[in-house]
């Protein structure tokens, strides 16, 4: 921050307490590494992420219902310059890439407005052992949002 900008910030009361954090440089969300699960009735979803290495995190998810495979997905998080890119290859569908629109120390949101559904995907850490993953896009009556509250689990299960 140059002297003129710092002086203006001080006059306007935008000191350290009100400073914004520079989000132009995305980082891989290392806090996502490990295994996560969601259990809702007969439905069980599990998502696994490798720790960041070589500028990439690899992930996979599997959802079963009544013990039968319902869907699976291969996932990739990588940096493209200063942008976090989330690439998903869902079972039976073409690969889709989403680019970061917001990245913080505890969350990230990626978007692809040209994709049918979802058009936005987000993850928000809630403490050491839980997170909310969500997808969002056009629905019958406006924006449709689905949230997936997940808890950390032992990867060996």
Each language-model region and where it sits:
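Well-ordered alpha/beta subsegment
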Residues: 106-112, 116-125, 132-136
